[in-house]
Design a protein with these regions (language model features):
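A structure-centric signal for secondary-structure junctions around beta-strands
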Residues: 50, 99-100, 134
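Short S/T/G/P-rich N-terminal loop/turn motif that feeds into the first structured element of a domain
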Residues: 1-95, 140-161
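Generic surface-pattern signal
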Residues: 26, 117, 130-133
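Conserved short beta-strand edge segments in small beta-sheet-based binding/regulatory domains
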Residues: 125-140
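Compact nucleic-acid interaction/catalytic patches
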Residues: 119-125
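Short, well-ordered beta-strand segments in beta-rich or mixed alpha/beta enzyme
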Residues: 54-58, 89-118
Length: 161
C-alpha cells in the first residue's frame, strides 16, 4: 500500500505541517483545491509519498439549520479523530453565495473509508439533502515527487468506479 510512511516521528511531523495548510485567497471555495491552499509551503520538507484528500463543496440552503449542521459535523469530526489517520480537517465558511469548501486530509484512503462508515458520519451525510442546495464530494491523490529541482506536489482526481 502506497501512502504515508509508517514511522511515528515522520507522521507527527506531517501532521504538524498539515495544520499550517490554509487558504491563500478569499475565494478559495471556488478555486481548484490545488490552487486555493498553501499546500506546497506547509508540506515542504515533509516525508510522504501520497496522501488522500477528500473535498466537500456545497451550496447551503438559505434556511439551513446551522446548529444542527454543526452538531452533526462535530460528531463526525470527533469520530474521525478517534479512528486515526486524519491529518487535517479544514472547515470552510460559506461565502455570500452560500458556497462552501471543506476538506479532510488522510494518511490513507483506507482510513478515510473506515471513518466514512461510522454511524456519526452516516448521520451527518443523511441530513445533506435538507442542508444543501447542491454538494459534491471529490477525492484525490496528493502525491509528492522529489527531483533534482526540488519537490513538486500533484493532485490526481480519483474518478468513481
Amino acid at each position: 500500500m502506497r501512502g504515508m510512511v509508517a514511522q511515528p516521528k515522520q507522521i507527527e511531523v506531517v501532521h504538524t505541517a498539515c495544520q499550517q495548510i490554509s487558504p491563500l485567497y478569499p475565494d478559495y471555495a471556488t478555486r481548484p483545491i490545488k490552487d486555493g491552499f498553501s499546500w506546497s509551503s506547509a508540506l515542504a520538507g515533509c516525508a510522504f509519498e501520497r496522501l488522500y484528500p477528500v473535498v466537500f463543496r456545497s451550496v447551503r440552503r438559505p434556511d439551513a439549520d446551522l446548529e444542527l449542521l454543526r452538531e452533526h459535523d462535530d460528531r463526525a469530526y470527533q469520530k474521525a479523530l478517534e479512528s486515526g489517520g486524519l491529518l487535517r480537517y479544514f472547515k470552510g465558511e460559506a461565502n455570500e453565495q452560500r458556497e462552501c469548501l471543506s476538506f479532510c486530509l488522510w494518511e490513507t484512503k483506507e482510513q478515510a473509508i473506515e471513518a466514512a462508515g461510522s454511524a456519526s458520519h452516516r448521520s451527518a451525510a443523511a441530513i445533506s439533502a435538507q442542508m444543501y442546495e447542491s454538494f459534491v464530494l471529490d477525492r484525490y491523490w496528493l502525491e509528492k515527487v522529489v527531483t533534482e529541482r526540488g519537490e513538486k506536489l500533484t493532485f490526481e482526481p480519483i474518478r468513481p468506479a
